[in-house]
Amino acid sequence: MMDKRVVAVAAVLWNVQMLFAAGEVIVPEGYASYYAESFNGRPTASGEIFDMNAYTAAHRTLPFGTVVELTNLDNGKKVIVRINDRGPYAANREIDVSKAAAVALDMLNAGVARVSIHKADPNAHASQQRNDRQTSPGVLPQDSFGVPPTAPTSSAPVMYADPHNPPPAPVGRRAGTPGVPGVANTTDVPASEYGAPPVAYAAPGSTPSRVPYGTAVPGSAAPNSHAQPVPSSSSYAAAAPLPYAAGGGKVSGMKSVYTPTHSGETRGVLWRIQLGAFVREENALRLVVKCARRALILHMSEQSTRCAWCCRGYAPRT
């Protein structure tokens, strides 16, 4: 009796080991294609610059940074890639791979291959990158995620506006008068050495003249080391209150959301909202409709570069 129990436990452990060794199956069978060389050096949907010599891939729903293992079902060859782009948008394609991954799968001549997709260990992807650099000394060095090192740029840093925790007014700079009804307590902060514009923080209980929604990423700003005045509320149109936050809860301490009145005001500024990862595209569209019913209007636009889906959120106008 004891021997039968030991055999049963050993069989269960063996099956579990084989399951974890194989990895989680994402797609048992689908078609893979690879990027044309003309895309090399262009930005991807994640913001990275596409490198055809790195082991990367594009998928419609998998989160950026996901590491998967592809197996060519016709010849048994495997490769580990990292998702850093969106696509492909052909009806019968499941994934797009870089040229380096296509060479590893031996699919350059055919252009398309039947593959299976399994979830992989990120450490295995890093090991594959190191081995490839040893065999291909002409390829630029890359980090553990397969991204070539980039030189620091002078672009403006990302700024976050928090109406609940305004920064203290620096010594020697003009601050607004607290306690005056209807007047926002603002601080004139000069543009930094990166050329980023100042951000106005509203005191609790007052109506801010401008509250950035989400994360605003300036496209280009001229360097300026002098203080710039905060725009007055008369130059902006009044917007309806936003009743729900991004997580579904009520918004507290925020009276209104700034709404652009013309396209020139949003030039160089892009709001990116990532709602989550979905296996099916219709599930993502269903969430967009749900958010629209909660007074959060999401405009999905297909970008020209690698067909990246971007969402722009605005409060509805009254």
From Swiss-Prot:
Lineage: superkingdom: Bacteria
Family annotation (CDD domains): DPBB_RlpA-like
SS bond list: none
Enzyme Commission numbers on file: 4.2.2.-
Region described as Disordered: 121-191
Record GO terms (molecular function): lytic endotransglycosylase activity
Lyase keyword on record: yes
Family matches, as Pfam families: DPBB_1
Keyword tags: Cell wall biogenesis/degradation, Lyase, Signal
Signal peptide: 1-21
Sequence ranges of Polar residues compositional bias: 125-137
GO biological process per UniProt: cell wall organization; peptidoglycan metabolic process
PANTHER family in the cross-refs: ENDOLYTIC PEPTIDOGLYCAN TRANSGLYCOSYLASE RLPA (PTHR34183:SF1)
Function description: Lytic transglycosylase with a strong preference for naked glycan strands that lack stem peptides.
Family: Belongs to the RlpA family.
Protein name: Probable endolytic peptidoglycan transglycosylase RlpA
Native species: Treponema pallidum (strain Nichols)
